[in-house]
Amino acid sequence: MKKIVFLYKILLVYFLINSNLFAEKISFFEEGKKLFEKKNFLESKILFEKDIVFNPLSEKSYLYLAKIFNFDSNDEEEEVNLNNVLLINPQNDEAIYMMIILKIKQSDYDESKKFIDNFNLVCNSFCSKKEEIRKKFNKIVPENEKSNN
């Protein structure tokens, strides 16, 4: 009988600990977002990475990491995180917009064009950026493409 009571106590403690860990997991993204808005990028980056550990399909955490790497001018890491967002949600127009800007910055005409075509199909909250994208894209259009249009 004592063993059964002891076993119940152990199970109770185990479930209490796990429920606290679960509650903590949920707040990683929200805390990271608050720190990001305060421009505390280093600490917010750590919290977004923790959120990804517990929730690998957290497209928002990947997106905020991409924004942090954009701010740090780390194009390689920004692209990795944007690709992760687009793998999780191919219609995330903010990620597509950021990828277009990155590809234009890298003077990658073909990829830029591909993302712009996709952006025109799925734009939702970033449709107002179409003119900005067009102007930036026209600066990298090759001469032979300009004559075809």
Language-model-detected regions and their locations in the chain:
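Canonical tetratricopeptide repeat
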Residues: 64, 98, 132-136
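Alpha-helical segment of the N-proximal tetratricopeptide repeat
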Residues: 26-50, 54
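TPR/TPR-like (Sel1-like) alpha-helical repeat modules
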Residues: 87-90, 100-128, 138
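Register position in tetratricopeptide repeats
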Residues: 37-38, 71-72, 105, 139-143
